[in-house]
Structures are given as C-alpha cells and as structure tokens.
Amino acid sequence: MENRTSDLLNRLSESATIAMARMARELKASGVDVISLSLGEPDFDTPAVLKQAGIDAINANETHYTPVPGTPRIREAISKKFKRDNGLDYAPDQIVVSTGAKQSLANVVLSLVNPGDEVILPAPYWVSYEEIVKVAGGVPVIIPTTIDADYKINPEALEAAINEKTRLVIYSSP
C-alpha cells in the first residue's frame, strides 16, 4: 500500500502558529530572551484550585465522554457568569463549550461553507482562519484594516466585499 497523505492535506499551508512557536522555542533554547505570542499558552502554571478540581473529578469517576456541547452544569455556570459579569442573557442551551475557538470556528465553517462560497475575514485575523476556510473548499476574502483606523472595518469595504457567493463574515476580537 502506498503511504501518502490526502489531497486536502497537501493543499494546506504549514501552520504559521506552529512555525512561530517552533522558532520561539529554538531562539529561547539558544539563550535569546523571547516573549512568544504564538500559541496562546498561558505564561503561568495551572492554579492549584484547578488542579484539585481535576483530581476530584477523576476520583469521582467523571472520566467519560461528555455531551458534545458541554455538560449541563458548565453551560449553566457560563450562563450565570455572562449574566452576572457581562449583562448578557443566554440560556444554557444557547451555549456550546469546546476545546477552543479554532475548533468551534472549524465546526461552523464546515457546517455552513460549500466549495466556492466566500468567507470574509477582516485583517488582522488569526492565521488559522484562512486555512479553515480552505479546508471547507471556501474562498477567503480578506478585508484590510489599518492601525490609523484602530483596525476597525471600513463599512464601505465590507459592503464592497459582499456578493452572491458570500456565506460568512468571521469577526474575531479579543
């Protein structure tokens, strides 16, 4: 049997995030003082209270697959947090918990985008977003922004980018 990767994989670019993380690790290992903004990894150890919660969950045999959108308990807690801290009123069944924003975004794009559909990405954007769109067969349409405009989308540029092939606009803000 021939050992080969899929055509889909061969069409994708190397993850710029992973490449930057590798470069940062190599520089750090060579003695360079590096602040890596690549992977979104915290620069602190896991707090003791979270470690203990994990240990307690294992000891309580909470070690099985959870519902895809998250457990009812965590979705309820998030709903309460949004209401209390952010003034946002979301019901638990409107909340989905995932392993990260990229996973959620990939789920949405793969669910809604067909080959040839266009997906608008205001720049700057997280480097993986363009590749996620390509995996679905979509066409990334980049709208540049500028520091002078505080990286805000120009409404005219957005309107000009929208056409009959536009399926999504991905707007990501910290």
Residue ranges and their predicted role:
Residues E2-G100, N107:
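N-terminal small-domain helix-loop-helix segment of the aminotransferase-like
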